Amino acid sequence: MGKYFGTDGVRGEANVELTPEMAFKLGRFGGYVLSQHELETPKVYVGRDTRISGQMLASSLISGLLSVGIEVYDLGVIATPGVAYLVKKDGASAGVMISASHNPALDNGIKFFGGDGYKLEDEKELEIEALIDAKEDTLPRPSAQGLGMLHDYIEGVRKYQAFLKTTAEGDFEGYNVVLDTANGASYTSARAVFADLKANLTVIGENPDGLNINVKVGSTHPEAMAKKVVETGSDLGLAFDGDADRLIAVDENGEIVDGDKIMFIVGKYLLEQGKLAQDTLVTTVMSNLGFHLALEEAGINSVITAVGDRYVVEEMKKNNYNFGGEQSGHMIFLDYNTTGDGQLSAIQLLKVMRETGKTLSELASEVTIYPQKLVNVRVKDNAAKKSAMDVPAIQKVISEMETSMNGKGRILVRPSGTEPLLRVMAEAPTHEQVEHVVDTIVEVVEAEIGVK
């Protein structure tokens, strides 16, 4: 990670850390870096979620892009994976998404995609950062004839929706589905897509006001959806996050089916169909021990990466795997798209239910999840979270807790890639053991580097 770019682009509190001035610089310098080798006039696609700051930041970002002669195509409100898909499909030079994903409305972010539809390599991000920090802006300043133009490209949203529907390879007639669009980027598209696929829908979290994105709805708050599934007697619930690159499901009994279980269900189906590349699923260190035991039982190999869907994608590209993801609900189907896609994942999950004739609870029952607890400890600043593992007291308590587990469980303490948080996670055979381990570590972390 660089000075401005984290694991998922540039993020911060809108109009405080991520200002219009910074958005302009990211547009100007990012656009320049990404279009240096274009033979024709470069074109860049821009999308955003429903945050109130999105229009402000989009205006500044687009101005920066136009100032270096780039043709900008404004997609308006669209899911992050929609931007990635359209950039690659249409042969655009790059794409930019304005979103802070599952974060609250006060935050926002700017994320770049290259012309291949993948998130930017670290080298390109560092190149952009160097231009931002340069003492003088020496980039070309074209006169009227060399400036870029802005085009509305709402048709792009419809193209993305049409693509999603093709991946269903049929319809979902007869299925009763609760959708939770998190008052976010999928608030119109998800209803349109699943209605066209003939599912009977109940939709929550589809009334964004600029401030309510991810508030008590969406993949990070599936409780309201779970309640609605039980109330309506639906077959399942499907919750996306603010930019719709994640999916968390709920079965017909209102039980949460997280990314690990969804990956197992879809991965096993792909294996049985001979469509799981190298019989391998790529996941991160956050995936549950029970998930890995289920994979082993099913004959599926696993490759483990650092936390972050970008690292999952890097591993998949490097070794030609086609399916991977995270417990948090990012799932990447490289046969279809270049990044995590919540709506695509939902369609694939429903497809498995349709083809097997099984309920979601039946499919999910093959994975026995070990008790897990995750606590996010807010620390003083980003420097504190990065140096946390060098603090002797924190090292000592982790070592003591690992010894107490006697090899029957695991502990993972890591910094958030996007916020000043230290994530403390443990898994063990019993809830009591997990509670004790996590609470003990959290107490020390808060005492040493927590916000007082």
UniProtKB/Swiss-Prot annotation:
Cofactor, how bound (note): Binds 1 Mg(2+) ion per subunit.
Record-listed Mg(2+) binding positions:
S101, D241, D243, D245
The reaction(s) annotated as catalysed by this protein in its Swiss-Prot or TrEMBL entry are:
alpha-D-glucosamine 1-phosphate = D-glucosamine 6-phosphate
User: What are the names of the required cofactors?
Assistant: Mg(2+)
What the entry lists under NCBIfam families is as follows: glmM (TIGR01455)
What HAMAP family does the entry give? GlmM_B
Record family assignment: Belongs to the phosphohexose mutase family.
Function per UniProt: Catalyzes the conversion of glucosamine-6-phosphate to glucosamine-1-phosphate.
Protein's recorded name: Phosphoglucosamine mutase
Query: What organism is this sequence from?
Result: Lactococcus lactis subsp. cremoris (strain SK11)
